[in-house]
Amino acid sequence: RILRFALVERLWITEGMSSSTDLEQIESRIVELVKDFVTPHADDAVASSCKDVADAVARQAVTSSEGGKRLRALLTLDSFRAFAADAAKEADFDAVLDLACAVEVFQTAALVHDDIIDDSDLRRGRPSAHRALASGTHSDAIGRGLGIMLGDMLATSSVDIANRAARRLSRSDDVVGAFLTMHREVEIGQVLDLAVELNPLDDPEELVRASLNVFRWKTASYTTIAPL
């Protein structure tokens, strides 16, 4: 499974599996989708005294969603182009683009939570989400809490995006089912990742087995398996 990931990444880097146009479409669409979901709408009953914090969380959702290789989204699009019928490649592209973006939004949710679990100060050279929110509220506890909720909102957003995209495709139930399976496997993988930290260091073979098991559940499930 590790070899599969390495080969896919190598293909993407050396053979140009996807064009710069794909990347531009992915980036702009992710921002559009995330903004629509997390930004309080005019008819949302948000107390005026709380609006600044709600707006800060919405802005951080966009900031956290920016950047990255977009390997998962690119692999989703390339899988679609490789296996879809010719007639579907144009008709279904917009829906598949949204589905690809949903995978990336879920990754962002996982990274926001990862940074809280790991107590990380930085993500992609900028303050991690919970650190940025702590700075804005002048409270580490509130920042962590808002970071947890931001991760939850992005995870929910990813399901909403995937569901809306799937409704425009055939076999929509299977698409949503695969997406939810990905969610479940990554979440189990995070539990296993934390469990490995409790393993004794005097059994290196078991450490290797447990670590590879984490890679299968937490990394491969949404980096290659789900996009393919």
Residue ranges and their predicted role:
Residues D115-I116, L122, T181-E185:
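Short glycine-enriched loops at secondary-structure junctions
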Residues A100, Q107-T108, G145, M182-H183, ...:
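A generic hydrophobic-helix recognition signal that picks specific residues
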Residues R131-V159:
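Multi-pass membrane catalytic core of lipid/isoprenoid biosynthesis enzymes
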Residues D43-C50, T63-R72, I148-S157, N163-L228:
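All-alpha helical catalytic cores of prenyl diphosphate-utilizing isoprenoid enzymes
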Residues R1-V103, T108, V112, D119-D140, ...:
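Conserved N-terminal diphosphate/IPP-binding helix and adjacent helical/loop segment
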Residues D94, I142-L146, F215:
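Short alpha-helix boundary/capping segments
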